[in-house]
Amino acid sequence: MAPSPRTGSRQDATALPSMSSTFWAFMILASLLIAYCSQLAAGTCEIVTLDRDSSQPRRTIARQTARCACRKGQIAGTTRARPACVDARIIRTKQWCDMLPCLEGEGCDLLINRSGWTCTQPGGRIKTTTVS
């Protein structure tokens, strides 16, 4: 008597390797962890790129790109020489010194055309930042 089609062994059953449920659980957890870790907490920023050009004497040009996750009414800006989420009004009105962009002990002054600001250190060294 021939074996019944339901209980007989299939020849192609070994073509696919068996994967345990533990493997799939691990894969799902790993993908969730990767997705979660790439998210920034609300109201925080991180520096993505930082380039420095010191080819000119007595002058260093630095460019940085930041990624921010700002809350409603905030926008990416600078506080204490670090990227931060600041009140959008500051950016709209170009009152850059309201962000407190300079380090503690430095003085902040707007550039004449409001395209940026300067931070003056007690020793007289001046750092100029322009917004692009």
From Swiss-Prot:
Originating species: Bos taurus
Subcellular location: Secreted
PANTHER family: CHEMOKINE-LIKE PROTEIN TAFA-5, CHEMOKINE-LIKE PROTEIN TAFA-5-RELATED
GO function term, MF aspect, one: cytokine activity
Source taxon at top rank: Eukaryota
Residues in the signal sequence: 1-43
Keyword list, A-Z: Cytokine, Glycoprotein, Secreted, Signal
Pfam families, per the entry: TAFA
Function of the protein: Acts as a chemokine-like protein by regulating cell proliferation and migration through activation of G protein-coupled receptors (GPCRs), such as S1PR2 and FPR2. Stimulates chemotactic migration of macrophages mediated by the MAPK3/ERK1 and AKT1 pathway. Blocks TNFSF11/RANKL-induced osteoclast formation from macrophages by inhibiting up-regulation of osteoclast fusogenic and differentiation genes. Stimulation of macrophage migration and inhibition of osteoclast formation is mediated through the GPCR FPR2.
GO cellular component: a single term: cytoplasm
Family: Belongs to the TAFA family.
Protein name per its UniProtKB record: Chemokine-like protein TAFA-5
GO terms for biological process, alphabetical: G protein-coupled receptor signaling pathway; negative regulation of vascular associated smooth muscle cell proliferation; negative regulation of vascular wound healing
Sites carrying sugar chains: N113
